[in-house]
Amino acid sequence: MASTTPITMEDLQKALEAQSRALRAELAAGASQSRRPRPPRQRDSSTSGDDSGRDSGGPRRRRGNRGRGQRKDWSMAPPPPEERQESRSQTPAPKPSRAPPQQPQPPRMQTGRGGSAPRPELGPPTNPFQAAVARGLRPPLHDPDTEAPTEACVTSWLWSEGEGAVFYRVDLHFTNLGTPPLDEDGRWDPALMYNPCGPEPPAHVVRAYNQPAGDVRGVWGKGERTYTEQDFRVGGTRWHRLLRMPVRGLDGDSAPLPPHTTERIETRSARHPWRIRFGAPQAFLAGLLLAAVAVGTARAGLQPRADMAAPPAPPQPPCAHGQHYGHHHHQLPFLGHDGHHGGTLRVGQHHRNASDVLPGHCLQGGWGCYNLSDWHQGTHVCHTKHMDFWCVEHDRPPPATPTPLTTAANSTTAATPATAPAPCHAGLNDSCGGFLSGCGPMRLRHGADTRCGRLICGLSTTAQYPPTRFACAMRWGLPPWELVVLTARPEDGWTCRGVPAHPGTRCPELVSPMGRATCSPASALWLATANALSLDHALAAFVLLFPWVLIFMVCRRACRRRGAAAALTAVVLQGYNPPAYGEEAFTYLCTAPGCATQTPVPVRLAGVRFESKIVDGGCFAPWDLEATGACICEIPTDVSCEGLGAWVPTAPCARIWNGTQRACTFWAVNAYSSGGYAQLASYFNPGGSYYKQYHPTACEVEPAFGHSDAACWGFPTDTVMSVFALASYVQHPHKTVRVKFHTETRTVWQLSVAGVSCNVTTEHPFCNTPHGQLEVQVPPDPGDLVEYIMNYTGNQQSRWGLGSPNCHGPDWASPVCQRHSPDCSRLVGATPERPRLRLVDADDPLLRTAPGPGEVWVTPVIGSQARKCGLHIRAGPYGHATVEMPEWIHAHTTSDPWHPPGPLGLKFKTVRPVALPRALAPPRNVRVTGCYQCGTPALVEGLAPGGGNCHLTVNGEDVGAVPPGKFVTAALLNTPPPYQVSCGGESDRASARVIDPAAQSFTGVVYGTHTTAVSETRQTWAEWAAAHWWQLTLGAVCALLLAGLLACCAKCLYYLRGAIAPR
């Protein structure tokens, strides 16, 4: 088997040198046969020193003329033969010790950083001419030995779908002077074609850059720069390429198109031969103008048809009831303030200020007046939300001379013009008999107006509901649209799904005997088609869709047909959830388990759960103050626990007796003497005589057994009564305290929303149900807790300490800071002192209080039989050892740490308007208070039945919906009593306490003139928006367009971030 010789680096070097010699010979032959002779050129003195010492056989660095101080650009073309020979002759021969002189290398690529890289394998195309054309490169037209002032670096772009949004840039020298001269063999100098001025891209990028493409997706241009966009595949990967294209030459000859293109785009001018086909600003401005015209034309189609009735004419005859009073006009009127009207009104037989009688909305200026009169005679129609005022007035002609006027409200004298009205006292004595009743008050010019007023008298008309008005609820231009009822008149009969419409009702479509009302574009188109192709609704739909179509077109071109819809979705719509709620309500819920409230759906607090991470802190036994004793009618010979076993329990006595160091014992003989006081036989004076001790002593005296009978006041031994008591601090076997530390605490509130269970916490305070979303204002979690589980003789309870204990501070002696044992056998704290035993008589006033700390009270109780007695023992707290005892725990802990101070706030948003069942039973205990036909709502209160909302009606007039239970509402009543109330089914009679319209008659004088009656107006934001709806609509359209353009810019910047930091 023949052996193979491995290829070494020396063999590769020889092969590269041979290839380099062949290529250099070809380049030299092509340069000598050029059609245009190259004149000899003197070497620049600035570079002669640098070239003189350079090895001619080594690779030549080609440097651009950008920022390096060179006037000649060697990267444009190789030097002429004469200059090459001169360079070789001036180059010293290499030293013998070095390698043989190297032959010319293949062309190298200038990196722009003073270095060069070998030319990579370009792959297809195989011809340098095809490679240059594929790059969009055009060598210069002029002589390469001269300067090229227009030479610059241009940038082309490539990106691959397989690499995401990673962009690659390729920088090349480019000129706008047209095509260069060809060699005699019809070829360009390859050195002129491969002339990069930036870092060499990766090999796969260069291969994709030189890959011929079969079509052109688009041509883009701005000013003198023109690019062609192509899509192609290299090895199964789809690439996008944006190549810089040449422009028309200065001599009029157009550069040839790339041979692989299939689409020719005609040039339109010598200055801008390659023109972008779309994107002129005129098209965008024309689109905005078209949108403005469409919106203006479709004004009637954007809003539903509403009953916008004009002000009615004065009633014929006047719609007033009762009598009027016109005999008290001599009184001066009350001057109002803050622009309100003033006047003294007569209600019944009493005089009252106008501000106390007229409705509140009249005082606030929420009414409009229509002045149809001159200064001699006129008719005034004042319309409010609930009533109309009518008035016909006659004025006297003004006097010839001005008259000063001074009032109590303003002491300054107001100068009147030459044609001033009559003095204030003139005309006030006129009778109201010639006036129409139903005259309404006038509005002041300002509060300090001192001019004469006009005579006002009459009654208000019957209350009227405002006309029905609708509005369309637009949701960011997204369907569906809804119809919103602003005001509703019951007699119009508008219903939504069979339910009467009320102010605030949202419904896709309303139905009434008059027809249908809707805001839906689809319904509008259908109605437009049905109504002989009316243009109103069609234009409304066009205005709705036009901004989005325009945004899509602009984005599609701005992003070069990539990602316009994705950018709009990601930037504009992805982070926004359009509201789809039908109703929203807010209420409170108490924090006790079982509490319930009524939002659009019932919500009940099922329970409260506590979650935490638990760390066991051990267990300890608290000191227990324990006492025992006996009342005996004889003196036993053995006073130990065994000897007193017949009277004292053995187990506790032994437990106390064993703690002698902390035990307290006394023995009282003849506890009850003839005087009935307690005495201790063991206490003696120094002289040996006895005395009565009316109060008990501390346990400092040993038991009295063994003394003589003389110490017992002479009673026989068999009649002596003795008391034995024993007390001590001990460890009780059934009293323990276990400690647990809780961290990362969290309170879980268990709610029931219309039968659906859900849990809310501070981290997730929302509850999503089929009925809608419930947001709960959850109180903050308590934080770290310490739990004390106290087990006292079977009665176990837990106490909670807020926060971690400060064992290096004031809590150092607390039970939680002591060393505990797992089996609860360790007593916590130091050994306490002895307790105090007190022998207390049964009638001692001390027994009305509680034993003090560390005290035990013993009271003998004489039995009902001879030689029978008992003992009553009361033990107090734990004395000085309270720090170690459960009393400290009770003082520093709570039983419920997660109970918030206030109720929970509930905000409920329904998915759609909730249709709860309607109650049909009549309401009970309904009372009506107020007046009827007076323009002021009457108060209706009662108890609504269960089973759903009650749609309350009074004498057939709809009042509104009320929830089950007690309700209080206001209603305008147009009928006199009696009143029949119902919820849609059976009716019941309500008790009424109302006054008739005659009691609402009024007369008076109000300041102000005709011309200034409505000079002072107030406007709410809603009224301002209604008056400027056209500007708001146009602004919304412009905002949508701006949002779309910003979305496109964001998307394009995301894809073109390679221009800032390319690979």
UniProtKB/Swiss-Prot annotation:
Annotated Gene Ontology cellular components are:
host cell Golgi membrane; host cell mitochondrion; membrane; T=4 icosahedral viral capsid; viral envelope; viral nucleocapsid; virion membrane
Kindly state which keywords UniProt assigns to this record, in alphabetical order: Calcium, Capsid protein, Clathrin-mediated endocytosis of virus by host, Disulfide bond, Fusion of virus membrane with host endosomal membrane, Fusion of virus membrane with host membrane, Glycoprotein, Host cytoplasm, Host Golgi apparatus, Host membrane, Host mitochondrion, Host-virus interaction, Lipoprotein, Membrane, Metal-binding, Palmitate, Phosphoprotein, RNA-binding, T=4 icosahedral capsid protein, Transmembrane, Transmembrane helix, Viral attachment to host cell, Viral envelope protein, Viral penetration into host cytoplasm, Virion, Virus endocytosis by host, Virus entry into host cell
GO BP: clathrin-dependent endocytosis of virus by host cell; fusion of virus membrane with host endosome membrane; virion attachment to host cell
Which residues does the annotation say bind Ca(2+)? 670-671, 718-719
Glyco sites are at 353, 371, 410, 429, 658, 759, 791, 1011-1012
Query: Location of site Cleavage?
Result: 300-301, 582-583
Where is the stretch described as Functions as E2 signal peptide? 279-300
Q: Which domain of life is it from?
A: Viruses
- Post-translational modification note: Structural polyprotein: Specific enzymatic cleavages in vivo yield mature proteins. Two signal peptidase-mediated cleavages within the polyprotein produce the structural proteins capsid, E2, and E1. The E2 signal peptide remains attached to the C-terminus of the capsid protein after cleavage by the signal peptidase. Another signal peptide at E2 C-terminus directs E1 to the ER, with a similar mechanism.
Per UniProt, the ranges with Basic residues bias are 59-69
> According to the UniProt record, where is the region Human C1QBP/SF2P32-binding?
30-69
Outline the segment boundaries, as ranges, of region: Disordered: 1-131, 305-347
Task: Extract the GO molecular function terms from the UniProt entry.
Answer: metal ion binding; RNA binding
Pro residues bias: start-end ranges: 93-107
TM annotation in the entry: 535-555, 1029-1049
- Outcome recorded upon mutating residue 599 to A: In strain: Isolate Ulrike
- Ranges for region Functions as E1 signal peptide: 563-582
Could you list which ranges are Cytoplasmic topological domains?
556-582
Q: Which residues carry this modification: Phosphoserine?
A: 46
Swapping residue 362 to W leads to an effect described as: In strain: Isolate Ulrike
Q: Is the Chloroplast keyword given for this protein?
A: no
Answer yes or no on keyword Disulfide bond: yes
Any further remarks?
A: Structural polyprotein: Translated from a subgenomic RNA synthesized during togaviruses replication.
Domain remark from Swiss-Prot or TrEMBL: Structural polyprotein: Contains two internal signal peptides that are necessary for directing translocation of the glycoproteins into the lumen of the endoplasmic reticulum.
Q: By what name is this protein known?
A: Structural polyprotein
Q: Which organism is it from?
A: Rubella virus (strain RN-UK86) (RUBV)
Q: What is the lineage of its organism?
A: Viruses, Riboviria, Orthornavirae, Kitrinoviricota, Alsuviricetes
